[in-house]
Amino acid sequence: MSLALGHGTIAGSTAAPLSEEGEVTSGLQALAVEDTGGPSVSASKAEEEGKGSQEEAGREGSRPEEALEAPSAASDERAEGEAEDWCVPCSDEEVELPANGQSWMPPPSEIQRLYELLATQGTLELQAEILPRRPPTPEAQSEEERSDEEPEAKEEEEEKPHMPTEFDFDDEPMTPKDSLIDRRRTPGSSARSQKREARLDKVLSDMKRHKKLEEQILRTGRDLFSLDSEGPSPTSPPLRSSGNSLFPRQRKY
């Protein structure tokens, strides 16, 4: 029993350091794993970033390809639509084919004759019925031209004098015009009115006459040509000129 216990104690004492060594080794291994894991993680991150950049570059490269494919597809659709709408119209000969389906051809003898004429004369006479030409159709007038012509026509109508006809009746009495009245003229007088002319001798004579009248007024205090036609009464005092004005009252010639 003692041996067993002793052995057990030895084993227990030896087991304790072994367990401590195991812990140390496991800790070292963990540290080693952590040390080795650092670069591996950075490498994995770098790989992921490289893959992301490659994917972005691939997307950017695919965008112009898609942009090029889109107009090409649109052009293909347009070409298909034009191909469906495109057609060649038939010629007059194809439309006006005879019942048997063969186009008209001159006989060989006529072709030979025409070639011989070309060889000898050089030209062929044109045998065709010349139809008369019709006059050109008048162009439709625009609204502006019509509006310009209308006022001109109205002005012409207004300018035309009214011509009297046998169907014109004047129901209202007309007042006689002065020109229609027979004026009595003195014998020897002309129908035309005399034109007044200004002469120097007449002007000078008028000035002398007015000067004499003014002297008469200043001397007598009375105007020869009074306003009222009646003569002056003997009881009325003579008019005297005031100092402010030469003429006491206006003369009437």
From Swiss-Prot:
Residues 115-159 are annotated as: Sufficient for interaction with NCOA1. The keyword Ligase does not apply. It is found in: Nucleus. Its association with the histone methyltransferase MLL2/MLL3 complex is suggesting a role in epigenetic transcriptional activation. However, in association with PAXIP1/PTIP is proposed to function at least in part independently of the MLL2/MLL3 complex. Proposed to be recruited by PAXIP1 to sites of DNA damage where the PAGR1:PAXIP1 complex is required for cell survival in response to DNA damage independently of the MLL2/MLL3 complex. However, its function in DNA damage has been questioned. This is PAXIP1-associated glutamate-rich protein 1A. Component of the KMT2 family MLL2/MLL3 complex, at least composed of the histone methyltransferases KMT2D and/or KMT2C, the common subunits ASH2L, RBBP5, WDR5 and DPY30, and the complex type-specific subunits PAXIP1/PTIP, PAGR1, NCOA6 and KDM6A; PAXIP1 is required for the association with the MLL2/MLL3 complex. Forms a constitutive complex with PAXIP1/PTIP independently of the MLL2/MLL3 complex. Interacts with NCOA1, ESR1, NR3C1, AR. The lineage of its organism: Eukaryota, Metazoa, Chordata, Craniata, Vertebrata. PANTHER family: PAXIP1-ASSOCIATED GLUTAMATE-RICH PROTEIN 1. Residues 160-253 are annotated as: Sufficient for interaction with ESR1. The modification Phosphoserine is found at residues 142, 147, 236. Disruption phenotype: Normal germ layer specification and developmental patterning but limited anterior development and arrest by 8.5 dpc, likely due at least in part to defects in extraembryonic tissue. The modification Phosphothreonine is found at residue 137. GO terms for biological process: chorion development; DNA damage response; DNA recombination; DNA repair; positive regulation of isotype switching to IgG isotypes; regulation of cell cycle G2/M phase transition. Residues 45-66, 194-222 have a biased composition (Basic and acidic residues). It comes from Mus musculus. The keyword Nucleus applies. Keywords: DNA damage, DNA recombination, DNA repair, Nucleus, Phosphoprotein, Transcription, Transcription regulation. Coiled coil: none annotated. Pfam families: PAXIP1_C.
